[in-house]
Amino acid sequence: MFPMVTEFMNYGQQTVRAARYIGQGFMITLSHANRLPVTIQYPYEKLITSERFRGRIHFEFDKCIACEVCVRVCPIDLPVVDWKLETDIRKKRLLNYSIDFGICIFCGNCVEYCPTNCLSMTEEYELSTYDRHELNYNQIALGRLPMSIIDDYTIRTILNLPEIKI
């Protein structure tokens, strides 16, 4: 008779423990009900990226001295720097500068080690195209300002999502 009573007590303890675990899970679910939604309507609303975000590289042609430091520090030797030596002034003159963003790993080494600060990272991350050859940006495409600076009126940036009224 005693084994039957102990089994019944164990069953009761297990039932109480299971109910407690279900209650804890339900409390976690209820705590998430008060939070703001994480999703946004992407093409029309965009979250503001952090200031350390590594997006598309912006290039200023006039500042570049064609030292090729960006090529040496790049782990995949990506930037293509074409220059010509001016013999009369004994300086390099930059002819072309290009980066293929289809291969770029956005490590930021080129920006960090550039002695003249002609390279900078922007917050632009929409680089998708249907043709991979369009991702090869030359000095003209790299010099264009990103959309966030131009201030496109059709896109609303979101710093804090609106609160839910219950």
UniProtKB/Swiss-Prot annotation:
Domain 4Fe-4S ferredoxin-type span(s) in chain numbering: 55-84, 95-124
Known catalytic reactions: a plastoquinone + NADH + (n+1) H(+)(in) = a plastoquinol + NAD(+) + n H(+)(out); a plastoquinone + NADPH + (n+1) H(+)(in) = a plastoquinol + NADP(+) + n H(+)(out)
Binding site for [4Fe-4S] cluster 2: 74, 104, 107, 110
Gene3D superfamilies: 3.30.70.3270
Membrane topology: Peripheral membrane protein
Xref: PANTHER family: NAD(P)H-QUINONE OXIDOREDUCTASE SUBUNIT I, CHLOROPLASTIC
Oligomer and partners: NDH is composed of at least 16 different subunits, 5 of which are encoded in the nucleus.
Protein name (Swiss-Prot/TrEMBL): NAD(P)H-quinone oxidoreductase subunit I, chloroplastic
Organism: Espeletia timotensis
